[in-house]
């Protein structure tokens, strides 16, 4: 079941008046509430959020940075998370019971996270155990549900982000002979390959057919990749790179490792959202860059670096649609309900799930 199926209508019904308010009036009200609430309110915002939302973030970052920020914040009573559902779940699990995590729009899910549900994962683990016994350890990208994080926690595994994937995959191989990486096959493949594992020692698990996709002796398999992907980064292609090389031969190409292996291999650089931001920041004035990641972030980088020539690797790219569900009207609505003493769209993860998921999260956080 996806998060969209779990949404209660009352939680996502933005009152009509927010559609008719001017941007200026909404921004004014957000500032007033932030000033009034002070440190009792904390607004983390992911880099992929719209500018209209990011401008009010108390901390902006990628998944790892926001997880660390959530874990360290003990002052705020209300954490209004401007990101997607799995990020708000992570914040809820890493904060105290007294802190309340709110997602301004409960429809802000993640298609990648929905590509691995707990029933599929338990079934896959059972079948893979028949083949490989006790030789596997699971790692899950943080872009996954709390239930999947809990699965990894109780099976000795951990979470990873694109910033620390190499560290965590290296650690995993000190624990077991084989790695099961979910839900993003591309990050898993690119990371394992960077660490020297040949492509022919990687298999793919298809959760829809409950089958292992691999040609060869299965005893040779070191990495089992879940057949999932990011719908945004899937849209960057080798053809995009060929077009840039042809029309702008002096342009650097930098992409996110959620792109497929062929795109990453053909690029000049690949790394996390933070890595991309830092690379552009440190690049010399006049340098040229084609960036393969989410469009809101690319546009923000372009605005912040007018001294550099920067374009999207895919000129027809669109933003992450679920991230974009968090907008200024929904942010203001969430804040005004808090101001009235109400709590809507509260993210509350089951206690048992939290305990097991935190095991996986802490195995990551203590190593980065």
Curated annotation (Swiss-Prot):
Name of this protein: Quinolinate synthase
Could you say which cofactors this protein requires? Answer: [4Fe-4S] cluster
Cofactor note text? Binds 1 [4Fe-4S] cluster per subunit.
**Reaction catalyzed:** iminosuccinate + dihydroxyacetone phosphate = quinolinate + phosphate + 2 H2O + H(+)
Q: Does the keyword Cytoplasm apply?
A: yes
InterPro entries given in the database record = NadA (IPR003473), NadA_sf (IPR036094), Quinolinate_synth_A_type3 (IPR023515)
Q: Its annotated pathway?
A: Cofactor biosynthesis; NAD(+) biosynthesis; quinolinate from iminoaspartate: step 1/1
Among HAMAP family, the record links this protein to: NadA_type3
Q: What does this protein do?
A: Catalyzes the condensation of iminoaspartate with dihydroxyacetone phosphate to form quinolinate.
Alphabetical GO CC annotations of the entry are: cytosol
Q: Where in the cell is it found?
A: Cytoplasm
Gene3D superfamilies (alphabetical): NadA-like
Q: Which organism is it from?
A: Bacillus thuringiensis (strain Al Hakam)
Write out the residues that bind iminosuccinate: 46, 63, 141-143, 162, 256-258, 273
What the record says about family reads:
Belongs to the quinolinate synthase family. Type 3 subfamily.
Q: Name one GO biological process term.
A: 'de novo' NAD biosynthetic process from L-aspartate
